[in-house]
Amino acid sequence: MDRTTARPNRRAVLATGVGAALAATAAAAGPAHAAPGRGARVEGRLRALERTHDARLGAFAYDTGTGRTVAYRADERFPIASMFKTIAVAAVLRDLDRDGEVLARRVHYTADYVKRSGYSPVTGLPENVANGMTVAELCEATLTRSDNTAANLLLRDLGGPTAVTRFCRSVGDHVTRLDRWEPELNSAEPGRVTDTTSPRAIGRTYGRLILGDLLAAHDRERLTRWMLDNRTSDERFRKGLPADWLLADKTGGGDYGTNNDAGVAWPPGRPPVVLAVQTTRFTPDAEADNVLVAEAARLLAEAMTD
């Protein structure tokens, strides 16, 4: 990678996202695989990483410029955890909002609702419980802070968790599904099919949302801006990817050490790369392993740029 190339500019990324629409469409249709030798080497390193960290690891990466793909357990199901939140916000933007009217609507909720939803660093603030929040503010809290109450309120407006599944089916994702609310959806028992996705499925869907034409241009820009401002991945993708890559992503975590990250990254002077890493472990109280996610991201980045 050319270290002298300037870091990608946020404004340029937001303005030209649709320029990668053809690449995103190619990813959805089934991208080319990496060269056999290179792909085997990367998969071997991911397998070794999985063994070292005593976890099950799934990974998917797609270079929208070259078509190069890395896939490891990419079609196996893993708990989706909070990665559903990107799709919920996209569904609000596509299916509910009209000319900003829905985004401007103020939603009121109770302290008990916050308590039942679990992790709620924004909606749980006393001033927000007292005054409510606009739908736009709920979307922002959902994506930048992974706020559970905000996500549940969006799901309520959409008609419940299965609205995420319906959205995915409508855009050709036949794997990703959501069945329960926060925080129950994070139980992550081995073998569970409900509330799951695969690295390839979530990677493709995220890529098409951020780079393609699934959303109107102004909605795609909103979604991407919120994901660029994500504050939950400092020890995951942001730790593993080169510091000069621009990243729009969403994390997720749950029981059984479930720990995920997925999004789109812009290397300097190169087309964007779609990335997804999902991990889970073998006991209900297992610790989430941020180092595993960060190291997997590092390996994927190296594979995309070597």
Curated annotation (Swiss-Prot):
Is Phosphoprotein tagged as a keyword? no
Please name the top-level EC class of this enzyme. hydrolase
> What start and end residues bound the annotated signal peptide?
1-34
What GO MF annotations does this protein's record show?
beta-lactamase activity
Keywords on this record? Antibiotic resistance, Hydrolase, Signal
EC numbers on record: 3.5.2.6
Q: How is it modified after translation?
A: Predicted to be exported by the Tat system. The position of the signal peptide cleavage has not been experimentally proven.
Which sites are catalytic? 82 (acyl-ester intermediate)
Provide the residue positions that the database annotates as binding substrate. Answer: 250-252
Give the reactions, separated by semicolons, that this protein catalyses.
Answer: a beta-lactam + H2O = a substituted beta-amino acid
List, alphabetically, the Pfam families matched: Beta-lactamase2
* Annotated Gene3D superfamilies: DD-peptidase/beta-lactamase superfamily
Per the record, the GO terms for biological process are: beta-lactam antibiotic catabolic process; response to antibiotic
Is Signal found in the keyword set?
A: yes
For this chain, the family text in UniProt reads: Belongs to the class-A beta-lactamase family.
Q: What else is known?
A: The class A beta-lactamase family has a specific amino-acid numbering system, sometimes called Ambler or ABL numbering and often misspelt as Amber. A multiple sequence alignment was used to derive a consensus sequence and then the consensus was numbered taking into account insertions and deletions. This allows use of identical numbers, e.g. for active site residues, despite differences in protein length. UniProt always uses natural numbering of residues, hence there appear to be differences in numbering between this entry and some papers.
Name of the protein described by the UniProt record? Beta-lactamase
Q: Which organism is it from?
A: Streptomyces fradiae
| Upper taxonomic lineage | Bacteria, Bacillati, Actinomycetota, Actinomycetes, Kitasatosporales
